[in-house]
A protein has these predicted regions:
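A polyanion-binding, active-site-adjacent surface
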Residues: 17-143
Length: 143
């Protein structure tokens, strides 16, 4: 993230989406962890056979959903061929295939599937993010 993070920002609900949008742009542009950035890019170049025709996201994955949500879902890190490929948390992998139908049934998702960014999925009163924003090698972040 940029070095300007010491600025105070308004915390009213009206300003929250703007601040979250700014944070997500900073996350996407982040290059603080050379090991993780290199791994994300490498995975994006050396693709799984099933995804050879995909243009991998291959950069830090921002959060997704309703900025004023009452439900926060926190994952560990993006999957190398899931979120690192699609650019959206829990999208395009087994964990998303399990989670999104449940969220849809509970009224937190507009549809039961999550294939890629721009597929029409919207979260309702829910926000999904991860503790680590880049797919780590062997799915194991360092402390």
């Amino acid at each position: 993230m940029s070095g300007n993070s010491t600025q105070s920002t308004p915390t009213t609900s009206n300003s929250l989406p703007v601040n979250l949008d700014l944070l997500n742009h900073e996350i996407i542009a982040c290059v603080r962890c050379p090991r993780l950035i290199a791994h994300c890019r490498k995975v994006g170049e050396i693709k799984r056979r099933a995804y050879l025709d995909w243009d991998y996201w291959a950069k830090p994955v921002p959060g997704f959903g309703d900025p004023n949500a009452r439900l926060l879902i926190l994952g560990l890190a993006p999957g190398a061929h899931g979120s690192n490929r699609t650019g959206r948390p829990f999208t395009g992998d087994g964990s998303g295939n399990f989670m999104y139908p449940i969220l849809h049934k509970a009224g937190f998702a507009s549809q039961p599937t999550a294939i890629k960014r721009g597929d029409g999925l919207e979260l309702i009163d829910a926000y999904i993010t991860a503790a680590v924003r880049c797919a780590p090698p062997e799915n194991k972040p360092l402390p």
